[in-house]
């Protein structure tokens, strides 16, 4: 592969004696280099144009920024002028306020002197009021002592009333408790009455069935007795027949056959009666067992009724009614006592209210007298104070008129 050559080599290449292939390669290479240089030149030209457009945009932006800066400078100068004008106006107002403050302090000093004089007079009046208050307190102390004497009896009655109210509350609670207890006992009594009626019916049924069983048992006993007697007679007859058979073996054949037949019939009747007797005895035993169970059940019911009647924890209905009557009588008595106490308390409160009304009237009269005296003194002081303010106002008006005359003369001369 041929080495790369520059532009100078290409220009100097015609002077060399080379082969036409090398010359052709050099020309191709020169064309490629020229093409690359043209592309590079175009790229640089486009970059230059872009930079020029950016430069123009920056110049326009710079121009706009300069214009904004000039506008801001103009606004700042106007704002500064306005602020300077405001500062000068505020300084003038401050100077005016200083002047007004000096005038006000002068007036306040004068008013303070007048108020100190007025305060001195008020101190003297306060001393008089304190002495008057001391006398009123002594009178009030005596009145309080009298009131304590009356309130002592009132407190005793109120304490008694409180105790009676507490007792009444306790009795009411007891009454409600007794009502609840009575209600529960009534419910228990109703339940027990129903149970008792059921037990009575059950006992009556058991007694009737027991009587029926006893009658049946007596009948069975009688039948058993009859069967036993029949059995005994039959056994006696059998024994007699056996004896006759053993003694009369020597008799004729028909007689022995007839006796055997009679003996067999007697044995059959004895066996039938014994089976019937056995059945009757079994039925008697069954009836005796049933009778014994019914007797035990009846005895249990009697024990339950006896326990209910003799139980100390469950009071009877009559005792509960007596206790309720006593509680109601006690409640009525306490209510009557409470009403009497309330009436007595109302009478005492009316007496205390009338006494307090008298005291209030006396105190109001004394306070009105004090207020009238204070109003008289205040009116005197107001008249003196108004005279002083009128003199100061007249002097101030005269000074202002002198100033106006001076300024009018000054401007008129100009």
Curated annotation (Swiss-Prot):
Region (Disordered): 372-399
Keyword presence, Coiled coil: yes
GO cellular component, one term: cytoplasm
Keyword Coiled coil appears in the UniProt entry: yes
Source organism of the structure: Danio rerio
Residue ranges that the Swiss-Prot or TrEMBL entry lists as coiled coil: 34-341
Basic and acidic residues composition-biased segments: 372-384
Keywords tagged on the record: Coiled coil
Descriptive protein name: BICD family-like cargo adapter 2
InterPro entries (UniProt xref): Spindly/BICDR_Dynein_Adapter
GO biological process assignments: Golgi to secretory granule transport; vesicle transport along microtubule
